């Protein structure tokens, strides 16, 4: 049996966790400026993006929307955007190559976090927007979560995030949203 010519690592049940989150956008009611919703972890003193583990039987897109709502308190939906992707159009066979796609809700980033002996955490990141009346709902977090959510003007929100990886993901989301121009 031959080995793959590409560096390959397999993870089996118990060696990985699948997670998803989103960068939640809105237009500020007063100024119309783009804002991003960030989380302040009140115990760890960290500014983060909303994300969490996928439930059994749940799609990764549903996870992103659910976790964003649970952690921020804002109902949201995935925002169709124009972006580069290697995913083919539905039902169309094409060569594996980068292409520009319009109005898609694919992940804008994948984070693979090495967790040492616990394996890896794989996080799919999406772009979302407010759904419904845009009012915050209290009491959506799990008992073990201690987040305060806040919409901040997009550029400032990116600088506010504690970790560079989160900053890079939020910056890419902002670039895609501005390129699409739909919010």
List PLM regions with ranges:
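Acidic, metal-coordinating catalytic segment for phosphate/diphosphate chemistry
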Residues: 1-30
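Short, solvent-exposed loop/turn segments that connect beta-strands within catalytic domains
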Residues: 28-35, 116-119
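Short, acidic/hydrophobic/Gly-rich beta-strand patch recurrent on exposed beta strands
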Residues: 37-41
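A short, flexible beta-alpha/helix-coil linker loop
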Residues: 44-46, 157-158
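A short gly/proline-enriched turn/hairpin at secondary-structure junctions
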Residues: 48-51
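Unchanged
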Residues: 53-168
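C-terminal helix/juxtamembrane-tail motif
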Residues: 171-183
């Amino acid at each position: 049996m031959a080995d793959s010519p590409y560096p390959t690592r397999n993870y089996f049940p118990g060696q990985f966790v699948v997670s998803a989150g989103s960068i939640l956008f809105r237009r500020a009611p007063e100024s119309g400026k783009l804002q991003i919703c960030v989380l302040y972890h009140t115990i760890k003193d960290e500014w983060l993006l909303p994300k969490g583990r996928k439930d059994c039987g749940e799609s990764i897109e549903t996870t992103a929307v659910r976790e964003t709502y649970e952690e921020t308190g804002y109902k949201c939906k995935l925002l169709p955007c124009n972006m580069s992707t290697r995913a083919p159009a539905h039902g169309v066979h094409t060569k594996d190559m980068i292409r520009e796609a319009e109005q898609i809700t694919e992940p804008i980033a994948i984070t693979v976090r090495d967790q040492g002996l616990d394996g890896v955490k794989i996080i799919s990141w999406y772009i979302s927007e407010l759904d419904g009346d845009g009012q915050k709902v209290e009491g959506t977090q799990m008992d073990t979560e201690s987040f305060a959510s806040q919409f901040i003007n997009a550029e400032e929100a990116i600088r506010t995030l504690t970790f560079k990886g989160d900053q890079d993901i939020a910056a890419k989301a902002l670039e895609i949203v501005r390129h699409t121009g739909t919010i």
